[in-house]
Amino acid sequence: VTPPGSDFELGTDGPTLILVGIDGSRTSWRAAAYAAGLARRQHCRLLAVYVARLSANIGAAPGVAAAMSEAAAQAAGEIEQRMRDGAAEMGLDFEFRAVMGDPWTELNRAAKELKADAVVVGASEHAGHRIVGSLATRLVRAGKWPVTVVP
């Protein structure tokens, strides 16, 4: 039941798009596997978003920005190929996006733009995130879609 004037329900009957954030970490690969299974069972599209973080040291020395950009492009290419191979094996409608920026901002932007029905991310492996707040916590607080955090 939807309360009058509520705009919470965004989608259609059944999901049409599952978004997974992937950065190459162990937990992000587990999140990708979970999201792929979910997309297969729900017969919907899977969008994987790789976000290369911008470093505060990007302008510290000549060539640093180019080297970082090249490394991010190489990592994104390897992740995309592995994801495409897995999606093809599962018969999934799959899309991949690689962007540079803040992971929360970029995942939030992609989810809004494409009207994702759910967002799946891996649990943070960084101890400092327990104090500052993890990407998953920030996505949950955005409150726009269901967020699944895979350990």
Describe each model-derived feature in a short phrase.
Residues 7-63, 88, 142:
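Small/aliphatic-rich secondary-structure junction motif
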Residues 63-67, 113-115, 137-138:
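Short, hinge-like loop/turn segments at secondary-structure boundaries
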Residues 65-78:
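A short acidic, glycine-rich active-site loop
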Residues 118-142:
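Glycine-rich, Arg-bearing micro-motifs that act as flexible, cationic patches
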Residues 142-151:
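Short, acidic/small-residue loops that bind anionic groups at enzyme active sites
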